[in-house]
Amino acid sequence: MAAKTPLLKAENVGIQFGGLKALSGVTMELHQGELIGLIGPNGAGKTTLFNLLTGVYVPTEGRIMLDGETLNGLPPYKITRKGISRTFQNIRLFGELSVLDNVKVAYHAHARHSMLSSIFRLPSHFRGEQEMEEKAIEFLNIFQLDSVKHEKAKNLPYGQQRRLEIARALAAQPKVLLLDEPAAGMNPQETKELMKLIAFIRERFALTILLIEHDMSLVMGICERIYVLDHGQLIAEGTPEQVRSNPKVIEAYLGEEVS
C-alpha cells in the first residue's frame, strides 16, 4: 500500500543569516488531520521555521511543499490563500478595530466580490459583506466572543485576545493552522479550555495543526506526534511517550520534570 502524500512537507530546509545558520536540514511532514507539536529551548529555531512555512523568510536550502506544490519564494499573502494560516507568539490584532472587524479582515483574502463592486457600491459588494459578517459571527460564537463583537480588540482581556487571534487565523479558511505559543500568558484554567478548543476546531474544520508550545501538559495532552528542535536542527520526532523518554530531548530541553 502506497504511503499517503503529506499535506505539508519541509524537506531539508534551512536558512542562513550572514554567517549564522538559524536552521539546517529540517525535514518534517504533516498529514491531513494531524495535530503535531513542535518544541525546543528558546532560540532553537521554532518561530524561524514558522516564518519559513508562511513565506516571511525564504529558505536558503531545501524546499517547502503544500499538497505537493513548492512554496519557496511565494509571498505570505499567496501562501495564506493556498491554505496556511498562523497565529503569532506576540499577539498581532488590530487593536483599534472591533472584534468582529478583526475576523472580517481575514475573510477578505477569499472575498467573492471584486474591488470594482466595492468602489461603485454594487449589489454584489453588499451581498459579499453580509456573507462575511455572517461567517465572522459564526466564528465568534464558536470562540465565545459573540458578546464582545463590537468591543475594540485592544480592550479584551488577554485570554480573549488569544482566542480572537485563533478565530482570525481560522477565518482565512486554512488547510494547515500554525499556532505559535497559544497558551503563553494563560492561567491553568484558560490553558485547559484552550486544549479543548484546539481539539474541537480540528474536528469541526478538518484542520491539520502544527503547534509551538512550552506548556508540556498541553503538548503531551493533545499532540499525536512531536518534533523537537535544538540549535536549529531536529533532534527527535515521535509520539509524546517516545519524546518524553528520549535522552537527547531530556538533556536538551525537558529535564527531569517529565522523564
Regions found by a protein language model. Give the residues of each.
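Glycine-rich phosphate-binding loops of nucleotide-dependent enzymes
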Residues: 2-259
